[in-house]
């Protein structure tokens, strides 16, 4: 549900007006990132990492692209995904999650795993993933591109590594709100690539 507030934001060399979309914090100013911005954040993250990781766990959907880039940069071959569903209603902060996808314990036990997501906003999903890794006997650390400290539900916890601190709603270049419309494109209707 879109908020009623319109926020004016400077985007690159152009000005843009965006309706707010975060139901938990409807008055956040939005910041739209470019791929160059993401590269800079990852370049800032990588030197922070302490030691090597046995694997990397990307939280869907936000962690897929930064996790893929980081796994390539660090040459991590053991790449896993976790998908966690929380009800999206504002009053559901205490709801229990549903794990839509999670690696089996045999891939986690006695390993050091880097958890990757795009942003630590309220922290629920990341903390529940880290808790499940700990229950499997896995040591883990958390890396995010952005850390929104003020909105975190966890006063005594946060990511081990982050590219930047923000108080804005971040729009990443892979999010559908900044991609060209694809509603007219249908799978299987395009030409096949030449061989």
What are these regions (language model features)?
Residues 1-195:
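PRPP-associated nucleotide enzymes
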């Amino acid at each position: 549900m879109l908020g009623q507030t319109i926020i004016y934001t400077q985007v690159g060399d152009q000005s843009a007006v965006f309706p707010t979309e975060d139901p938990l914090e409807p008055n956040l100013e939005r910041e739209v990132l470019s791929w160059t911005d993401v590269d800079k954040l990852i370049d800032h993250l990588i030197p922070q990492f302490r030691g090597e990781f046995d694997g990397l766990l990307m939280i869907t959907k936000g962690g897929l692209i930064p996790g893929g880039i980081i796994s390539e940069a660090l040459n991590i071959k053991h790449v896993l995904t976790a998908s966690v569903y929380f009800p999206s209603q504002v009053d559901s902060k205490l709801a229990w999650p549903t794990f839509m996808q999670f690696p089996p314990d045999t891939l986690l036990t006695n390993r050091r795993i880097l958890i990757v997501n795009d942003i630590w906003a309220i922290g629920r999903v990341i903390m529940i993933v880290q808790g499940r890794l700990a229950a499997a006997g896995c040591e883990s650390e958390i890396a995010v591109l952005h850390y929104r400290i003020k909105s975190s539900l966890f006063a005594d916890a946060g990511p081990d590594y982050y590219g930047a601190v923000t108080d804005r709603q971040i729009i990443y270049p892979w999010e559908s709100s900044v991609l060209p419309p694809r509603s007219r494109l249908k799978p299987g209707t395009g030409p096949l690539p030449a061989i």
